[in-house]
């Protein structure tokens, strides 16, 4: 946010990620990410990618997917249907639900830029 200098002061932006959220699982992930990425904190979509992979893993485990090539189309549908309407998914940051492929209670965050720094303003939940 330094490129715009003082012209960015007061500009509000949204993000899927608030690095200040704290829970044991997220804190452990942040530390491991920083270690693997030269001290950088996770990027805004990092938790989304992480959750997507673990949601697919959970779908495979809970729907009886076998990996049988003869059932490929059927089993892919099981995974997709599970993920599209999962309830109580324990994600990296919080527990959340999906309805028809859309998160129903997953927050976004509003930040305001001041002197090149993003400052938290508000958590917004659908």
Role assignments for model-derived ranges:
Residues 1-126:
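Extracytosolic ligand-binding ectodomains
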């Amino acid at each position: 946010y330094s490129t715009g200098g003082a012209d960015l002061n007061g500009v509000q932006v949204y993000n899927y990620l608030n690095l200040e959220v704290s829970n044991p699982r997220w804190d452990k992930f942040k530390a491991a990410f920083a270690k693997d990425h030269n001290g950088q904190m996770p990027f805004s979509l990092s938790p989304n990618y992480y959750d997507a992979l673990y949601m697919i893993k959970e779908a495979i485990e809970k729907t009886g997917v076998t990996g049988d090539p003869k059932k490929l189309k059927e089993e892919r549908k099981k995974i997709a249907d599970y993920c599209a309407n999962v309830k109580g998914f324990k994600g990296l940051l919080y527990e959340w639900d999906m309805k028809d492929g859309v998160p129903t209670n997953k927050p976004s965050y509003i930040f305001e830029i001041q002197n090149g720094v993003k400052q938290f303003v508000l958590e917004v939940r659908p």
